[in-house]
Regions:
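Bacterial N-terminal signal peptides that target proteins for export
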Residues: 2-12
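Sequence-pattern detector for short linear motifs
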Residues: 9-10, 50, 163
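A well-ordered secondary-structure block
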Residues: 100-195
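Short, well-ordered surface patches within globular domains
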Residues: 30-117
């Protein structure tokens, strides 16, 4: 009887821990938004490692080092919040909004998002996403020592234009901003690249 109670307590604790992890994944502006008990100095390390993984992946594909630099997370947060609302918390609908529209080669959500973020006419914007596994998150933020290689590959592979500026130059560095959260029970990172 006592062993049964212990098992139930363990299972309930595990379920509660998973629910807390999923609920604490939030989009972030500047630094990722954290639960009150998580120190904010830990929020940037995972993003730095993701940025390093992006640069490594880009170098492997195009032989261009340090192509991505840390930018503001504001646009990524805006896109994430738009996707969450637009999709009705349906991950498939959110992903569909991020895929390429064959009519104009931009992301399906481009017009709606551009009305919200009001980009500079001299800047090019891309949007991208990658799913995250639980081992890449810690207390709702990107984990410091996680292996982000596959995430970086997805972020580069899933990039879609929001707007293409006439001043765009392919070799120019891109500012990268990130937002991490959960849509439809799936943790993901949304990235916005600006050049």
């Amino acid at each position: 009887m006592m062993q049964c109670v212990r098992r139930c307590s363990f299972i309930c604790g595990a379920v509660l821990s998973i629910l807390l992890l999923l609920c604490s994944c939030q989009s972030g502006a500047g630094q990722l938004i954290l639960p009150d008990n998580v120190p904010s100095e830990n929020t940037s390390q995972g993003k730095k490692e993701l940025l390093a993984a992006l640069n490594q992946e880009y170098f492997d594909q195009f032989s261009s080092p340090n192509h991505f630099i840390q930018g503001s997370d504001d646009a990524a947060k805006t896109v994430f919040l738009y996707l969450k609302q637009y999709s009705g918390d349906d991950i498939n609908k959110a992903v569909e909004a991020l895929t390429e529209n064959p009519k104009d080669d931009r992301a399906n959500c481009a017009d709606d998002v551009l009305r919200i973020i009001s980009p500079s006419p001299s800047e090019t914007y891309w949007v991208s996403y990658s799913f995250l596994s639980a081992d890449m998150l810690e207390d709702g933020v990107l984990k410091e020592n996680a292996a982000f290689g596959s995430v970086a590959k997805d972020l580069i592979g899933h990039r879609r234009f929001l707007v293409l500026s006439e001043a765009f130059h392919p070799a120019a560095s891109q500012n990268a901003g990130f937002a991490v959260g959960v849509i439809g029970g799936q943790a993901l990172v949304v990235a916005v690249f600006v050049s």
